[in-house]
Amino acid sequence: MTVTGPISADQLGFTLIHEHIYLDLLRDAWLTPNYLDDPELAHIELQRYKDAGGVTIVDQTSGGLRESDHDLLFDQDLNHLKHADAVKQVAIDTGINIILGCGWYRETYYEPRLWRMKTDEIAEEMVRDVTVGIDGTDVRAGFIGEIGAHFNSVSAIEERVLRAAARAQIKTGVALGTHATRGPQGLQQLDVLMQEGVDPRRVVIAHSGSYPRHKYHAEIAKRGAYISFDRMGNLKTANPFDFKRSLRLIKEIIDAGLIRNLLFSHDVCYKTDYVTYGGGGYDFLSTQGLTVLNKEIGLTEEQFKTIMYDNPRRLLTGEGA
């Protein structure tokens, strides 16, 4: 399900599994000037992706991250837009398939009411987002996530939200993505999801590349879930150490025979990720990804297609999982 309606599996094409169109990171105050709030810039940057052959984007902007509490998103008649409607508008304008996520990000970004809600109540809210519409709109979510955790562990309230996400995933059948940075908490998240009965083949652990341990990546993949290297635009701007480390980790996954569990994306979440401001944008992978990865680690065109076409399709649809 995209923000403009259902599509078939063969319409997914080249897919970025973890991006953001509009994003409010004001709770991390040091990022205040850098969050994604400019519809004109969003259109320009997304059009670059479309023009480069990009077809689908999964926008994992969950509750707490949505740019809807500030009067910054408008339609052509200057009417204030809710986040989901603003994403729908840019999808219509560019022709990109945008699949919008739901749920809640991480504890720092939760609304106070979540502490008073039971697990099943939170789950039902996510189910409504998928089956009816997000935040009172008719724009339906087609994905659950990103569902986050702190840097080294899952807090008690984050576990409640994660269990709710698991129950919503089972009821709706859409794929689920977690947020796990610079630590091994992705395995703890998988433990919780699998305890609730979620098929790990419908789960992607985001930001896996930020924890540079092959053993961690291999364990995620061996359980059946997907490893997401989703700051790939950084290959354009990374220092030599980070550049070589990322390439080494990717090659280790492929050499271990785990390519069917590997996903790439850019996680555009700051204005400085835009091409306009020197970043890789949404189009680095579609314009330069294969060339860079072939030169550095010998990635073939067939392998690149597996990562950018086949793997996202299996995650999102469950077909051939």
Identify the meaning behind each predicted range.
Residues M1-G5, F284-A321:
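Mid-to-C-terminal alpha-helical segments outside catalytic/metal-binding sites
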Residues H18, I57, W104, Q169, ...:
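Divalent metal-coordination and catalytic microenvironments
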Residues L25-A29, D69, A84, Q185-V192, ...:
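Histidine/acidic-residue-rich catalytic or RNA/ligand-binding cores of hydrolases
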Residues L46-L78, G95-T108, R140-A149, A175-L176, ...:
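Divalent metal-dependent hydrolysis catalytic cores, especially in the metallo-beta-lactamase
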Residues Q89-D93, N97-T172, Y226, M232-L235:
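Active-site gating/metal-coordination segments in enzymes
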Residues A166, I170-E252, N261-L262:
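Catalytic pocket-lining loop regions of alpha/beta-barrel enzymes
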Residues L176-G177, D230-R231, L258-G279, F304:
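Short acidic/histidine-rich active-site segments
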